[in-house]
Amino acid sequence: MNIKKVDKYSFLEFKDDKFSLYFSTAENGLNFNINTEEGNDNIRNLKDWFNVKDVGYLKQTHSDIILNYDSDKELLEGDALITDKDNTLVGVFTADCVPVLLYDKSKNVMAAVHSGWKGTSDMIVKKTIIKMKQEFLSTASDITVYIGPHNKACCYEFGEEALSEFEGSGIYDISEIYKDGKLDLEKCIVKQCKSENVNNIKCLNICTNCSKEYKMFSYRRDGKSAGRMFSFIIKK
């Protein structure tokens, strides 16, 4: 992992052949909340900062809607974007939910997924992998998955009354994903990947709520004043 500096801001950077993956931090208050003028300005800046033609993102709704990215002319609702377009960036906004970036070097396809507890219970990452297989002919062994900073099991308190959403999936063992009143979203997502025979999984192991090494936004910690981070993948 590298730290990419852009102006006064810091991004966590990973590179693999033609793919570059970035996770923004809250360093110097870099905010991508699209409900603010500042957030929209920063989204527009990404084209110059990272030298790309198109920037793809969605109006996130905690759904399992997965869309193929075509252009940035219209803001659509959903929580995952897939594309094989060159010189393009696709990403998701988070402030505790899990950003998941996927790519397949063989078929030159990439995806960005926003997986909060609802999206995780609806298995949006698994469904994204299935869509990559069906529509872009990806094979499991060619897919790489990065699980970014989120509210990890050390901090993510979750009410037992909603655990029923995770039962009956056939891949979750509640005793493994839920302990001492806390839910392990990362473990859920890893299980989704492995259920599709995707085993090349990289976990950043950064908690948005309690990380001391990196400055992160956390809605649980900071409330409505929390900014939004942007996690994205580029194919050149």
UniProtKB/Swiss-Prot annotation:
| UniProt keyword Oxidoreductase present | yes
This chain's function reads: Purine nucleoside enzyme that catalyzes the phosphorolysis of adenosine and inosine nucleosides, yielding D-ribose 1-phosphate and the respective free bases, adenine and hypoxanthine. Also catalyzes the phosphorolysis of S-methyl-5'-thioadenosine into adenine and S-methyl-5-thio-alpha-D-ribose 1-phosphate. Also has adenosine deaminase activity.
The record's annotation in Gene3D superfamilies points to: CNF1/YfiH-like putative cysteine hydrolases
Enzyme Commission number, as recorded: 2.4.2.1, 3.5.4.4, 2.4.2.28
Q: Recall the GO molecular function terms of this protein's record.
A: adenosine deaminase activity; copper ion binding; oxidoreductase activity; S-methyl-5-thioadenosine phosphorylase activity
InterPro entries linked to this entry = Cu_polyphenol_OxRdtase, Cu_polyphenol_OxRdtase_sf, Cytotoxic_necrot_fac-like_cat
List required co-factors. Answer: Cu(2+); Zn(2+)
Q: Which family does it belong to?
A: Belongs to the purine nucleoside phosphorylase YfiH/LACC1 family.
Give the catalysed reaction(s), semicolon-separated. adenosine + phosphate = alpha-D-ribose 1-phosphate + adenine; S-methyl-5'-thioadenosine + phosphate = 5-(methylsulfanyl)-alpha-D-ribose 1-phosphate + adenine; inosine + phosphate = alpha-D-ribose 1-phosphate + hypoxanthine; adenosine + H2O + H(+) = inosine + NH4(+)
UniProt subunit comment: Homodimer.
Pfam families reported in the protein's UniProt record: Cu-oxidase_4
What is the protein's name according to its record?
Purine nucleoside phosphorylase CA_C1699
Give the UniProt keywords, A-Z: Copper, Hydrolase, Metal-binding, Oxidoreductase, Transferase, Zinc
Q: Which amino acids does the record list as binding Zn(2+)?
A: H62, C97, H114
NCBIfam families from the xrefs? peptidoglycan editing factor PgeF
